[in-house]
């Protein structure tokens, strides 16, 4: 029996969260086409042939001077120090530059490369990309094609990961899908609904805080604050006669209800907190990086 932690690293939009959901065959990680959708480390658990693999989905690696984005990158880098193996995820359409940047961070643990989105290309393109990575073969343990959509090569990827883990009893109850609290997952579903219902830039000025939860046998009651930075943005979140906020709430309720397996009463509020993205203490609280 083996058990260990795998940190999923890659640039924003490489498909890391989608890959986690495909391995779990459940929706746990926030998925969005927008960059930096993943803001907290999400730990998802996969049992593969009696071995326990704990995946840590991290914020994407990218270059940015913004305080918030710097903290996201620091969070991702720190996760590389706290794992047994790194899974570097890259789209088959990406150049090797992101991988070279990753190597420049001097990772101290073994890593595997997953070339994602191979269902969107042909064999010739895939083989060409594999040959481009071949010159780095001394650095990685294995490189495998992967399709989060079709779950192709799923067993092969998990087999390679297990090879890098140590013999160890389970760290968590094997019935768990994630060790993140349900409250954190609810928050991510609300944030995902914001991403899906608003324009490209506006969601980056927002965050979600769960204020209250009450769980009964047949009903889950949630109250949450959407934090934004200006009154004009607040108006955009609410929309004409509250239409936008209602749409966000409807989408989030559906996602949360599917996870909770019960009816959900969700109350959303919009609060203005100016310059929240530069408030380091507030950001550390959001990212669970408090000491």
Curated annotation (Swiss-Prot):
Keyword rRNA-binding attributed: yes
A Pfam family per the record: KH_2
Gene: era
SUPFAM superfamilies the record matches: P-loop containing nucleoside triphosphate hydrolases, Prokaryotic type KH domain (KH-domain type II)
Alphabetical GO biological process terms: ribosomal small subunit assembly
Domain Era-type G: start-end pairs: 2-167
Residue span of region G2: 36-40
Subcellular location as annotated: Cytoplasm; Cell inner membrane
Membrane topology qualifier: Peripheral membrane protein
Protein name as it appears in the record: GTPase Era
G3: region residues: 57-60
Cystine bridges: none
Region (G1): 10-17
Protein's job: An essential GTPase that binds both GDP and GTP, with rapid nucleotide exchange. Plays a role in 16S rRNA processing and 30S ribosomal subunit biogenesis and possibly also in cell cycle regulation and energy metabolism.
Domain of life of the source: Bacteria
Record note on quaternary structure: Monomer.
Stored HAMAP family: GTPase_Era
Record GO cellular component, one term: cytosol
Organism: Campylobacter jejuni subsp. doylei (strain ATCC BAA-1458 / RM4099 / 269.97)
Chain residue ranges for the region called G5: 146-148
Keywords: Cell inner membrane, Cell membrane, Cytoplasm, GTP-binding, Membrane, Nucleotide-binding, Ribosome biogenesis, RNA-binding, rRNA-binding
